[in-house]
Amino acid sequence: CGSSKNLRFLVGFGAKPQRNFEDKKMENLPIVHVVNGRQKKLLQGHPWVYGNEIERVEGEIEDGGLVTVVDFRGRYMGTGFYNSKSLITVRLLTHRQEEITDELIASRVKAACDYRRFVMNRPGTDSCRLIYGEADRLPGVIADRFGGVIVLQVLALGMERFTQTIADALLACEKPDCLLLQNDDAIRRKEGMECFTRVLYGTLPEENIIHENGVKLAVDVLGGQKTGYFLDQKDNHLFVRQFCKDARVLDCFSYIGAFALNAAAAGAKEVTAVDISEAAVQLIEKNAALNGADITAVCANCFDFLRAQVKAGEKYDVVVLDPPAFTKAHANMASACRGYKEIALSAMRLLPAGGVLATHSCSYHMPEEVFVNTVLSAAQDLHRQVRVITLRRQDIDHPVLAGYPESHYL
């Protein structure tokens, strides 16, 4: 970080905000008082206030409306949107006393796009996450670029009013061929919002082919998971690729085959990709054809497939485990650990000495230390000595906001 330009992006707006603790509330806004002891996380930059953290409310509040948040002494903590229907009752837009305007929102969209333009200038890659919600100070907003198509999601009630502002700013900054508003996520229902999908600009192509690390990928932005594809693993796909030359590779929970395709691009001698979804397997086969790759795509439950491969005495040089989140709540962590350990046990049984296991968890509720210890306990049960080559995270277009640990999940 030798230059000021680099330093700006490294610390960004994660730097500790300046605060004025005088008894000033934004004029005419209702006031939310948080209970004593809960102000610490807000002082550290956390952007959420849960319902059980609210002591009392002053003034009439409408869901989706702006509120001022103060601590138990009445000191200013931030300004955000209120939603009584959401577990996250207040989503803070700022920890400073500044007016929330269309211009402010547009400037944050531009800053988010500028950051990605700076860090994602990678040959052979034309897709990335442009807006990552709270980490870009745009709570509940997701925008992913898939080649010429941008997919936008607005998942927080208070941000709904800024949809057109966000869309216009994305069009101005990125100049895509198509902008799709994909507001059909279940999170919107939990927020009390309507679910729908609409093209805001341009024409959605019948087939959308993106490029990642020089690999071609057909992405289904309408029927696929989330916005169509998981962009957080781009750098990890490339990292795993280096172990795959002349290797026999098994990619479990493959979705559309990204790890498998990177293995094939590395010169793997045999690649098998497994997913439980028939639609995903069809995309794996399509993507293999697009890249001229020889990949065996299997539609199966990965737990069952792994057990069957162990029983059959199969061996692989590289096994990739990239399952969906096994837990979305801390209360389910024990069950999640059992799931991660089971697939790790099977994978290790398939690996010879010197084999490589790339295993992942994509849940904030699974702490890194717990996940690593779960995998290592599988090795201990098998009396296998393992080396941890690296601990990796989501790609750099999914930045982690200081004070907001939920933004680190992979």
Where are the language model's segments positioned?
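Non-catalytic accessory regions of SAM-dependent methyltransferases
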Residues: D23-R145
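Mobile active-site "lid"/loop adjacent to the S-adenosyl-L-methionine
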Residues: Y316-S346
